[in-house]
Amino acid sequence: MIIVIIFLVIYFNNQLYMCVSSTCVIQWCAIQCKRKEANGIGTCKPRPNQGKIQYRKLKEECHCVYKCS
């Protein structure tokens, strides 16, 4: 029983932190920039003090820890 629980925790953790492809991250990031900037043009760069870009798969969308600048 414990083994099953551990397996499920590992499985769901991987689902949350794995991104299907970098393309969906770029697309999501571009959408965020368009929402934040009136002209719809923006470049996405990693946030400062973010050692590594974090990808999360949530509700079939990929999100990234990025800011628009």
Swiss-Prot record:
- Range of residues in the leader sequence: 1-15
Supply the alphabetized keyword list: Antimicrobial, Disulfide bond, Fungicide, Plant defense, Secreted, Signal
Q: Which residues form each disulfide bond in the chain?
A: C19-C68, C24-C44, C29-C62, C33-C64
Keyword Ion transport listed? The answer is no
- Cellular location of this protein? Secreted
Give a Gene Ontology cellular component term annotated to this protein: extracellular region
Please list the GO biological process terms of this entry: defense response to fungus; killing of cells of another organism
- Which family does the entry's similarity section mention? Belongs to the DEFL family.
Q: What is this protein called?
A: Defensin-like protein 166
What organism is recorded for this protein? Answer: Arabidopsis thaliana
